[in-house]
C-alpha cells in the first residue's frame, strides 16, 4: 500500500515555504510521492536535497490536470480529501484503515492551498476533517498520517541516509556521513 499526496494549488512566492513543508511532512510521515499542480523549481530542489541527505525514496511530480490524476488513481485506490468541513477524524479513521486493509488499495490524500473545487469533495471516497477550526494543511496532513500509520513512521530511518539523528534526553546526537 502506497500513500500519495495531491496538493491542489500553489501560489508561487506566497506558498513556497508552506509547500516545501507539505512535501517534507509527507515524506517524513510515510508518503511515497507528492503531486503538485504547478511547477516550482525551488520546492522541488529543496525536497530533492532533503531526500539526498536523509535517505529513502520520495517522488515529486507535477501534473497538468489534478482531476484526471485523481480519477485515474481512484480506479485502483482510495481518495481522502482533508478538509475542515469533512467527517470527524476520530469517528472515521478506523473505517478508512479497514477499507484500505481489506482492499489493499493505495491511498491518495488531497489537500488544498486555496479554495478547493467542489469536484474534489465529490470525487473523494472520504472527506475528512482534522478539527473544525482554521489551521494549516501541514497540521492536518501530519495528524492524518500519524493516526493512519499509528505512529509507525515517526522514527523512520533509511540505509542510504547521510544524516541520522538518534533521540536523546539531554544532547543533540547527529551522525553525518563524511564524503
Curated annotation (Swiss-Prot):
The record's annotation in Gene3D superfamilies points to:
3.40.1280.10
| Annotated transmembrane regions | none
Look up the domain of life of the source: Archaea
Q: Which GO terms describe its cellular component?
A: cytoplasm
Q: Which reaction does it catalyse?
A: cytidine(56) in tRNA + S-adenosyl-L-methionine = 2'-O-methylcytidine(56) in tRNA + S-adenosyl-L-homocysteine + H(+)
EC code: 2.1.1.206
> Can the keyword Ribonucleoprotein be found in this entry's annotation?
no
Q: What does this protein do?
A: Specifically catalyzes the AdoMet-dependent 2'-O-ribose methylation of cytidine at position 56 in tRNAs.
Q: What is this protein called?
A: tRNA (cytidine(56)-2'-O)-methyltransferase
Gene source species: Methanococcus maripaludis (strain DSM 14266 / JCM 13030 / NBRC 101832 / S2 / LL)
Upper lineage: Archaea, Methanobacteriati, Methanobacteriota, Methanomada group, Methanococci
Amino acid at each position: 500500500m502506497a500513500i500519495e499526496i495531491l496538493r491542489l494549488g500553489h501560489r508561487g512566492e506566497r506558498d513556497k515555504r508552506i509547500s516545501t513543508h507539505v512535501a517534507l511532512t509527507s515524506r517524513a510521515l510515510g508518503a511515497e510521492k507528492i503531486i503538485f499542480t504547478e511547477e516550482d523549481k525551488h520546492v522541488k530542489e529543496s525536497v530533492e536535497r532533503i531526500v539526498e541527505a536523509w535517505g529513502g525514496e520520495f517522488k515529486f511530480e507535477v501534473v497538468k490536470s489534478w482531476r484526471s490524476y485523481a480519477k485515474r488513481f481512484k480506479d485502483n485506490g482510495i481518495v481522502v480529501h482533508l478538509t475542515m468541513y469533512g467527517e470527524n477524524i476520530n469517528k472515521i479513521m478506523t473505517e478508512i484503515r479497514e477499507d484500505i486493509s481489506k482492499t489493499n488499495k493505495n491511498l491518495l490524500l488531497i489537500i488544498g492551498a486555496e479554495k478547493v473545487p467542489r469536484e474534489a469533495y465529490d470525487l473523494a471516497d472520504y472527506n475528512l476533517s482534522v478539527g473544525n477550526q482554521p489551521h494549516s494543511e501541514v497540521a492536518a496532513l501530519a495528524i492524518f498520517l500519524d493516526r493512519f500509520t499509528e505512529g509507525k513512521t515517526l522514527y523512520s530511518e533509511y540505509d542510504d541516509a547521510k544524516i541520522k539523528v538518534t533521540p536523546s534526553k539531554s544532547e543533540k546526537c547527529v551522525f553525518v556521513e563524511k564524503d
